[in-house]
């Protein structure tokens, strides 16, 4: 607890504000600023908290310096959440000290994976953190490069869920989406960088106390702090804060306020007020500094992840809390939140599933019958809702914000990805159906509103059955696939030819022969 020898009433009140953990961080930090301006001498009669954090950090920084001394660079994976920010603070401090001591440094990287479906409310925050980082790197002349990576097209949520119809990740299902959207792109980038600059050690901010499930998995893998580990694929990694409590995380970020004489480190962000403010908003307005790992509210422990993530259950508590605690700032996300809740509600609605499988037994020619994918009608419905939300946001932007939108759920590239998947799997009744929906909603004024959400009752998934396709479908054993004409429609092609339109040709993916394809114009 901080104390002062001053008998001045204002000084005593300011010290009481600093010591009051129930007050928002911004209020307490403002108290620090005023105390500093007034040149009031204050001391901590229990300095152990700050000293413990410094001792903990120094141990980790020395471990990271030791990695650099082996000639290996650091590759820090960041989401700019509280844990990865801690790892970045520690890594940058280690890099600064190494360069100061030796006059050079191995090439290091800060890597962020843009899934393209993050919470739109965090866009400004991500941009601010990235700008702060790049200014810090240039100011200190560090050989550190910020790299933003993206998942492969076939892993994009729009292609996988709206295009192919693969079910989103619901509670109890594997989280392979996280691997496809974040882990794989980062690992791919690090392998490419290692070939150019030498071996890299990944700095990862996972902590055992985030959840019991996480803790068990980390123990089974043999994860320990401050030791260079070898992953399953041979990737070298170090987990600096794997044994930290959430209090340690918030303490470090709090003590990295460059405006305070009490700052532990002057890092890439002048302060982490923005980080704390975001977590507070997602925690129903309560100060994140007062919430621990055990017994914490769900929002503070929640991930600021994908806007359509359904793993957390029937509600995205983090997003809901942001909207409810600061409606003036985040109410524009209410429609997106409702879309997410709608997707959760239709999980067990078998009438929204596609029953016919997409692969067959080459020996027997039988196709599986089991409802494991969204039907085309459901995918089309979801796309219409998303495009409607985009159109409404654009209307607001044109009227109130100089045409600058706050989010875009479906961009042009994603439309093409959806149409590609619909064409490959013969889902839509005609070519470029997704582009047509975009045109009708954005240019012709059509709107599709999400109605009352009714949660379908849980049902067992019917057992897999098999069906033999009619002989007329002509299954080719040579090509091991069902013949499809794709974009080739003889009637449309002939009509276009009679109208004097030049007919384009494409090379068939399977026969390698050229063929005419239908002309489509919006």
Predicted features and spans:
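Catalytic cores of secreted/periplasmic lytic hydrolases that degrade extracellular macromolecules
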Residues: 81
